[in-house]
Structure formats: C-alpha cells, structure tokens
Amino acid sequence: MAKRDYYEVLGVSRGASADELKKAYRTKAKELHPDRNADNPQAEAQFKEVNEAYDVLRDADKKAAYDRYGHAAFEGGMGGGGGARGAYGQQADFASAFSDVFEDLFGDFMGGRGGAARSRAQRGSDLRYNLRVTLDEAYRGVQKTINVPASVACDSCKGTGAEGGAEPVTCPTCSGMGKVRAQQGFFTVERTCPTCNGMGQIVKNPCKSCHGAGRVEKERTLSVNIPAGVETGTRIRLAGEGEAGMRGGPSGDLYIFIEVREHALFQRDGVHLFCRVPVSITAAALGGEVEVPTIDGGSSRVKIPAGSQTGKQMRLRGKGMPALRGGGAGDMLIELAVETPVNLTARQKELLREFEKLSEDNNPEGKSFFSKVKGFWDGMTG
C-alpha cells in the first residue's frame, strides 16, 4: 500500500511553519494515542504514521529531502550510504525526539528511567474562607474569630499514617519510583503507581485513627486580624493554616477573602464615601445648614448654598475610608436631594400659588428649557 503524503497525514499545507507542524502533530497524536483508542485497532497504525510524518517534517534536512524527492528520499538507493533504510533511515529514538510534545500532552510520558518518587512528603492544599464584614468594621479594622474545617495532622501517628509511629516502607509495585511502566504498542508509557498513588511508599500497618492517611478532619478556631481599609475582594493570607501536608509535608495556606456588606447610609467607591442627604425646598432656595453623619460615628455641619439643586455635591475632605496600606483617608461626598413637600394644607397651597406668580424670573433652568422647546416646535412648523 502506497504511503500517504506526510503533509496530508498531519493535515497541514506544504508551506506550514515549524510551529504549525508541531501544533498539528500534538493534535493528531493526542487524538490517535493508543491509550485513548483501546477499541480501535487502526488507531495504533495511524499513530505510528503520524509520528513518522512528524519525525521527517520536524527536521530541516529531512524535510528538504522529502520536499524534493518525496518518500523515495528515505528508501534504498537514494545516494550516500543510507543502507536499507535510505539516506534518512527511520531509526529515530521516538522517546527522545518527541518527549517535549508528549510531556505536554500526557504528563510524564516517555521519560528516562528516572529515580525514586520525587518527594514522598506532599504539601497540603490551600484553603479559601469567605468572610463578611460591615463597612464600620472595614473602617476601623477588627479582630474576627472564624471556624475552619480542614485536614490536620493525625495526633496518633504524627502524620506518618502508620500505626505506632512506624515508618512507611518502599512500595513493592513501583520499587519506590512512584510510577509504573506499560507497553502501548510502539511506545512505553509511564503512569502514576496505583498502589502508592505516586508516593513511592506504602504503610503496612495503617493508623487506626486516620486509616493510613496521616490526616484527620477537624474544625479549627482561628483569630484573624482584619486591617482598616479592606474592601470587597481584599485577600488576607494566613501561612500554614491550610490543609495539613502528607507524610510530613508542610501545610498549605489559608486565604481569607473579604466581602464588605452594604451600608444603610453610605456608598463606597474605593477610599471615598457618598451620602445622599435630603433638604427642604426652602433650605435649598434660601440656603442654610444640614448636619450629616460620618463613618467615624460623629457628624459634621455642612453649609447649603442658596439656590442649590438636587444632585449638587459637597466634599468633606478626609472623612472617607482609610487607605489599606497607609496614605491617609479618602473624602466624603454629600449629594443634596431637594424634597418636594407633600400633604399640603389649603393655606400652603395658596401660598405656593402666590409664590409661583412672583417667581417667573427665579427659575433660570426652567425658563431656558421652555425656550428651547418653543424653538424646537417653531423649527418643526416653520
């Protein structure tokens, strides 16, 4: 049966770059690997074909010869003493030629002989704890007590997993390597040892308290210092307070993620605070003062300029939130909301009507608006 064109095998054009060739090879190799196609007898042959094509096209000299002579470049008779396999005989060591690709695809695949398991001790996992605080607590800083369920080192075996504190022994399945090898057609594949789970050691007499795990589940009570200035999304790291390590390995870390609750009066934007303050129509028109609360528990008197409109903002410097890492505090912005009176008495209504008759020149924005409306309609009808 005639060999297929190598470019066709990889599904690329003849002008494909080295990166495009490698990407195409990785895709094909992953798709056709015997481990993933145990029920497809043709996959192994196709897998070999893909490897053969890539072995040629990845090498600049072989590729040049193939582009010029085709498959004949690798068969007997093409000058230069290539022997029965031709000038570029297919005797490459695929284990070394493709190790960089397969390590990406399948993990520790096609490696050398290696040694014992890299580390019998394993670091514990990191933990996440979501903690809600009030805006007042975020302003002042606070000490919080939290309960964290986590795996901790077993007291009975001191984390070894063995009864009576005995030492683990070398795994008989992998001889301490943590991996086992299996032949898959054309290749030798390494997998994590199923007996010791890659640890390289086993426990002959498991601890009765932790069943050989070396860890037990336990709820711990921790005290956490929340600094002033935290905001939603702030992350606090507590080193060594995560899951306990395996076989004497170090513990992971605990990460506290802060969520600041909404406040009834203040809205926050970084270090600045906003407060919407209602004022009477007379105070807005004539001017006056209003007392506003501040986040520190006090209050400040703010002057309202005569003629203030809804939305007017005034700033109280330094009355916002403290910066988390120092640098002073933000500001507090006060936004006026002019209230329209409701439930008017007959006398109040009478006074307002009288006021309206006298206030034609006192509403500049309204006058300007209606002038624009008139101009708009005149333009439509003219």
From Swiss-Prot:
Compartments where located: Cytoplasm
SMART domains recorded: DnaJ (SM00271)
Name of this protein: Chaperone protein DnaJ
Statement: the UniProt record of this protein carries the keyword Repeat: yes
Main location: cytoplasm
Species for this entry: Cereibacter sphaeroides (strain ATCC 17025 / ATH 2.4.3)
Residue stretches of each CXXCXGXG motif repeat: 154-161, 171-178, 193-200, 207-214
UniProt domain J: residue ranges: 5-70
Segments crossing the lipid bilayer: none
Disulfide bridge positions per record: none
